[in-house]
Amino acid sequence: MSTKRGVTSQDSISLLPDDLLCRILSNLPTKVAVRTSVLSKRWKRFSLSVPLLEFNVSEFHGYYEFARVVHGFLDTSRETCIHKLKLAFEKKQHDRSYLTQWIHNAVKRKVQHLDIGRWSYLGQELIPHSLYTCETLVSLRLHNVSLPDFDHVSLPRLKTMHLIDNIYPNDALLENLISSCPVLEDLNVSRDVENIVKVLRVRSLSLKSLILALDGDRYGDIEDDSWEVVIDAPRLSYLSLRDDQSKSFVLSSVTSPAKVDIDVTFDVVRSVLKNFLLTRSVVRNFFTRLSSVRDMTMSGTTLKVLSRYMRHEPLPQFPNMIQFYAVFCNSDLEKLPNFLESCPNLKSLVLELEVFKKNDLLILSSSIPKCLRSSLEHVEIHTPISGAEAEMKLVKYFLENSAVLKKFTLQLGCKRMDEESIIFKELLRFRRCSASCEVVVEV
């Protein structure tokens, strides 16, 4: 097809200014930009200068083709800065490693966003020391690589750092790396028990969001009670903990975050055999530090620990909590009123339950928590119910005792239509303490 001037449409694209061509290529997937290099030397020059680079080894014919292409794009003789570099790859143990050089080249070209992901756990991929002094870096994600020790860190612009299943030479490296990022706001650290770091200290004056995960369960029962987490982050607004190994969680100089997601065990299985009194002190101090939280999500594992804790002393109060998402084991559900009593101003409650058997019993305290009398507006049972006696007793408990309830939502998991009909009839028989309550049934 020709234009009025007799120039082909393909030539019209080639006549575009350099900066516009570069912008067009930057908006294409990197693998598509690579293909344009065969059009001409000019197109090849532009395709190798795009600032957004994403390479996945699965899109190439093996690791060495992947490595050859990445080499070409990360040539340090090019003057263009790299806005983002993302590498996702795996290699066999005998394959030559180029990762250290690739990252070093990206640092030289003033990379701002770096994302390195390895799928294989064979061998170690070492990052270069130059990464520790990359003054242009804004976000960093490292997965399954090895971090060397350092003498100096300067990451003045780094705001987001995700460190997933990496290898560290000692506890101090990770602590110093985190504390050496003066504007860090978002931190995600995932470890397993082979990562060496047993005592994780997070110290940051700028941190707003913190996600910590430690998976010890996949390695079986690790007979070691020296695992510990210490958090000193006064500006923290979101905290997520997933940890089945650490015995102690210390929140030092932390103003209670607005939102927390807690799935921890406090190593309570071994503590029962050793010193549960000490664990009670750790649990008490931890949740007292969270007393100002507004939005809490809690796992069934943590709730089970708290149920055991409440045999000896009451929970701390959470006067500011307005939203609570809780996963309850059926055996702990009788403690629900006690939990709610600790949340006097709660407005929204979502419950995730185990499946009840038809004749399972549920005994709930006759005392009515303050939040049911004055503040609770929304309740949802997230797990589908089938009409078991214990399930219906729980539904009845909320409908008959919640004075300001606006909406009660439940899901049905019945196998037959007649079972659903029985549940609907029973719901209609329940007295509602709140005249304005809407019952929503999802089938």
From Swiss-Prot:
Swiss-Prot/TrEMBL LRR repeat ranges: 139-165, 166-191, 219-243, 275-300, 325-353
Repeat as UniProt keyword: yes
Top-rank taxon: Eukaryota
One Pfam family recorded for the sequence: LRR_At5g56370
Segments forming domain F-box: 10-56
Keyword entries, A-Z: Leucine-rich repeat, Repeat
Gene3D superfamilies, sorted: 1.20.1280.50, Ribonuclease Inhibitor
Keyword Metal-binding attached: no
InterPro entries reported for this sequence: F-box-like_dom_sf (IPR036047), F-box_AtFBL13-like (IPR053781), F-box_dom (IPR001810), FBD (IPR006566), FBL13/AtMIF1-like (IPR050232), LRR_dom_sf (IPR032675), LRR_FXL15/At3g58940/PEG3-like (IPR055411)
Annotated FBD domain residues: 361-412
UniProt feature coiled coil, ranges: none
PANTHER family documented for this protein: F-BOX/RNI SUPERFAMILY PROTEIN-RELATED, PROTEIN WITH RNI-LIKE_FBD-LIKE DOMAIN
Protein name: Putative F-box/FBD/LRR-repeat protein At5g22670
Species per Swiss-Prot/TrEMBL record: Arabidopsis thaliana
